[in-house]
Amino acid sequence: MEDATYGYKVPLLFIIISVLFVSAVVIIAPIVSSVHTIDEASFRIVVRSGLIYKLGEESPYTGHIVDTLESKIIKYDVVNGLKHGEFSISTLEGNFSVCGFVEKNKNVGSWKYFYDDGRLESVGSFIDDKPQGNWIWYYKSGKVKSEGNYLSGKAEGRWVKYDERGNMNLMIYYSNGEIVSEVKFSLPQFI
């Protein structure tokens, strides 16, 4: 995930996660994918009217789903046909890519995003599927890359970007997702 100073990665990553989920559930799962419950019983799932069902059953599914898609493992719980509870995407090697919570198919609470090697990339919260509150992004070194706040899914207030040495190099002020002002900082370059 990226901060609002880049203006695209938070919504882009959310879209990618949504597309991966929809692809797994709507397109791939009914055709070719096996989905497993905790007890390893295989079955196919389908989505009807926004609810998840076991193929051939009339009642919405409740249980745990583990699926694979494009070398990623997707795990989540389903209650009465809706994603509800822990949600994670991890690599085949076991490193998390994304982990968070879902209530009635909407992202809520704290979410963490990771680099492919398992190191933390960003952390923030969602309310009703929209980024909310303080979000922090990290370099692979673990140093803070940028931080800022969301209000109802839109960048709000002061956002700061740092270089890899920890020096502030950009400060942007947002109001309702729109840039109000921007200040760039530069340090003298020593040879």
PLM region descriptions:
Residues 2-115, 119-139, 143-151, 156-161, ...:
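Periodic aromatic/glycine/histidine/acidic cluster detector
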